[in-house]
């Protein structure tokens, strides 16, 4: 389920190119968009939630610069790593050319105890749904 976005001036640094942390943030937008498209209301999911999903690892690699006005598309795949951890791998395209790739690893914890807990059923279903899309090539 691709996510499309225009690069804004606020996404760029003093040199006029997208700042690396901003592209990671835009990748996170794609993740949130996917959750919403699946029917997970993010506001309700995290409001007084017994679950938190901190990012424990993030990396990004650029193959060419992105500029204000560029329209990008982000595709990502998901991989379940354990009962409480998953990873998203993003590919960022400009006019069908991959210009960057990124990865984020998320862990499910109980926010007060700060201990790992199993992913909630809604996220397990979302992970399964995305895995099915990947397998069928949709």
UniProtKB/Swiss-Prot annotation:
GO terms for molecular function: 1,4-dihydroxy-2-naphthoyl-CoA thioesterase activity; fatty acyl-CoA hydrolase activity. Its EC number is 3.1.2.28. Pfam families: 4HBT_2 (PF13279). Pathway: Cofactor biosynthesis; phylloquinone biosynthesis; Quinol/quinone metabolism; 1,4-dihydroxy-2-naphthoate biosynthesis; 1,4-dihydroxy-2-naphthoate from chorismate: step 7/7. The keyword Hydrolase applies. Keywords: Hydrolase. It is an enzyme of class 3 (hydrolase). This is 1,4-dihydroxy-2-naphthoyl-CoA hydrolase.
């Amino acid at each position: 389920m691709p996510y499309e976005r225009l690069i804004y001036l606020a996404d760029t640094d003093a040199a006029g190119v997208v700042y690396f942390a901003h592209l990671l943030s835009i990748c996170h937008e794609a993740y949130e968009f996917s959750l919403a498209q699946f029917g997970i209301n993010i506001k309700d999911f995290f409001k007084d939630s017994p679950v938190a999903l901190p990012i424990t690892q993030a990396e990004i690699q650029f193959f060419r610069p992105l500029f204000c006005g560029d329209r990008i598309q982000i595709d990502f795949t998901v991989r379940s790593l354990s009962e409480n951890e998953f990873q998203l791998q993003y590919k960022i395209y400009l006019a069908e050319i991959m210009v960057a790739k990124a990865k984020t690893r998320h862990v499910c914890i109980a926010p007060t105890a700060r201990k790992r807990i199993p992913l909630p059923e809604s996220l397990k279903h979302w992970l399964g749904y995305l895995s099915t899309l990947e397998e069928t090539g949709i």
